[in-house]
């Protein structure tokens, strides 16, 4: 009797194991929805573990599986614990990143939170990155909208643009004024930039620009919408890290919607393990530009570039000066992750470097600080 029960239990265990294996295997053919799913703010689309369909990436402490992978761009992986046959796990941070402190609260590396109704934030290795939940507040109003202003809406968190119809004026008249001295940068604009205010481009014009734009713009005409757009693009910011992989940003409205967006690119001024003074020639105080001795793969969020490159890096000085990129170009680079997921990112490639005493990394105030559509910024005390 006991042997019969033991055989029955063994059969049940075997069937359960085979069922779990069948569920964990990938289908012979992929069948995906026609439209990609819409994810919550701050949540990206990734391919499932079978490499078939785009799904919303699972976040820190959320349940995960082969068909519901974690967000690898935030350094998360699906932790199945000690079980080798488990089908579901929990998203955990791949490495012990630094926690974040914001508004007297501690957030773990990879944790997402909403500090207010206008921002969705994520802690990434000690830095808090946020995206706006009210993008309409940060985009340019319709150029045909006279005297645009933001007003609060009852029962809603986000403000909306309204137009005053009292005085309708052609926004593109007096182009000499638009491209004249009014585009200069003065000290009063620093406060406006900090408060995310826009400055009128020309006298009597409803066109606006960001205070940080100091160069002459060009005018783009959209024949489909019958609108003209003053196209403006800032220079790329300094790399966020003096060694290792960092991020460089710029702001532009060079798009069909004429909407201000922040563009990012991966940058690496120099490897963190690069020898400091060993390559200096006798009598020299600086080593400006150095080329990688052998082809290397770029890394981003735990993923490797598909191709190998021989990038140039900036050297170092012994007299207190710092070496920073002088001429750069941006290339589109393809990355592949361990789960087979591939994606493209803009990457900075250094062409030449310069050495001087202007070292902006010694002062955090030197970093550009914008809050725009699709923005990711760092909160500072």
Swiss-Prot record:
Protein biosynthesis found in the keyword field: no
InterPro entries xref list: CCN, Cys_knot_C, Glyco_hormone_CN, Growth_fac_rcpt_cys_sf, IGFBP-like, IGFBP_CNN, Insulin_GF-bd_Cys-rich_CS, TSP1_CCN
Single biological process term from Gene Ontology: positive regulation of transcription by RNA polymerase II
Top-level taxon of origin: Eukaryota
Gene Ontology molecular functions: extracellular matrix binding; growth factor binding; heparin binding; integrin binding
Ranges for domain IGFBP N-terminal: 25-94
Positions of region (Heparin-binding): 279-315
Gene3D superfamilies: Complement Module, domain 1, Thrombospondin type-1 (TSP1) repeat
One of the Pfam families matching this protein, by short name: TSP1_CCN
Domain VWFC: 98-164
Keywords linked to the UniProt accession: Cell adhesion, Chemotaxis, Disulfide bond, Growth factor binding, Heparin-binding, Phosphoprotein, Secreted, Signal
Limits of the TSP type-1 domain: 228-273
Phosphoserine PTM sites in chain numbering: 188
Disulfide feature: 26-50, 30-52, 32-53, 39-56, 64-78, 70-91, 286-323, 303-337, 314-353, 317-355, 322-359
Chain ranges of the CTCK domain: 286-360
Subcellular location field: Secreted
Subunit structure: Interaction with integrins is heparin- and cell-type-dependent and promotes cell adhesion.
PANTHER family: CCN FAMILY MEMBER 1, CONNECTIVE TISSUE GROWTH FACTOR-RELATED
Function (record text): Promotes cell proliferation, chemotaxis, angiogenesis and cell adhesion. Appears to play a role in wound healing by up-regulating, in skin fibroblasts, the expression of a number of genes involved in angiogenesis, inflammation and matrix remodeling including VEGA-A, VEGA-C, MMP1, MMP3, TIMP1, uPA, PAI-1 and integrins alpha-3 and alpha-5. CCN1-mediated gene regulation is dependent on heparin-binding. Down-regulates the expression of alpha-1 and alpha-2 subunits of collagen type-1.
Similarity comment text for this entry: Belongs to the CCN family.
Identification of the protein by name: CCN family member 1
Taxonomic lineage of the native organism: Eukaryota, Metazoa, Chordata, Craniata, Vertebrata
Name of encoding gene: CCN1
């Amino acid at each position: 009797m006991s042997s019969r029960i033991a055989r029955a239990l063994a059969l049940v265990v075997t069937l359960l194991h085979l069922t779990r294996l069948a569920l964990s295997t990938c289908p012979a053919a992929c069948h995906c929805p026609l439209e990609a799913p819409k994810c919550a703010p701050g949540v990206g689309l990734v391919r499932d573990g079978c490499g078939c369909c785009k799904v919303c990436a699972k976040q820190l402490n959320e349940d995960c599986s082969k068909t519901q992978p974690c967000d690898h761009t935030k350094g998360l992986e699906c932790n199945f614990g000690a079980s080798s046959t488990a089908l579901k796990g929990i998203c955990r941070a791949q490495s012990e990143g630094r926690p974040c402190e914001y508004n007297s609260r501690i957030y773990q590396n990879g944790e997402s939170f909403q500090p207010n109704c206008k921002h969705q934030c994520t802690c990434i290795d000690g830095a808090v990155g946020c995206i706006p939940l009210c993008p309409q507040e940060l985009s340019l109003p319709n150029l045909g909208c006279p005297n645009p202003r933001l007003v609060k809406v009852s029962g809603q968190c986000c403000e909306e643009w309204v137009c005053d119809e009292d005085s309708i004026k052609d926004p593109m008249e007096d182009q000499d004024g638009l491209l004249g001295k009014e585009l200069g940068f003065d000290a009063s604009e620093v406060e406006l930039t900090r408060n995310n205010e826009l400055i009128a481009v020309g006298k009597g014009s409803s066109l606006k620009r960001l205070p940080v734009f100091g160069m002459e713009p060009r005018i783009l005409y959209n024949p489909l919408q019958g609108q003209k757009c003053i196209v403006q693009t800032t220079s790329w910011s300094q790399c966020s890290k003096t060694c290792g992989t960092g991020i460089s940003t710029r702001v532009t409205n060079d798009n069909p919607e004429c909407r201000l967006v922040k563009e990012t690119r991966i940058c690496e001024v120099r490897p963190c393990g690069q020898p400091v003074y060993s390559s200096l020639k006798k009598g020299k105080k600086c080593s400006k530009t150095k080329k990688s001795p052998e082809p290397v793969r770029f890394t981003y969020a735990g993923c490797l570039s598909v191709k190998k490159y021989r990038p140039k890096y900036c050297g170092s000085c012994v007299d207190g000066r710092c070496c920073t990129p002088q001429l750069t170009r941006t290339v589109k680079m393809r990355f592949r992750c361990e789960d087979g997921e591939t994606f493209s990112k803009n990457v900075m490639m250094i062409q030449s470097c310069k050495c001087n005493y202007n070292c902006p990394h010694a002062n955090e105030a030197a970093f550009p600080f914008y809050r725009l559509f699709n923005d990711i910024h760092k909160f500072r005390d």
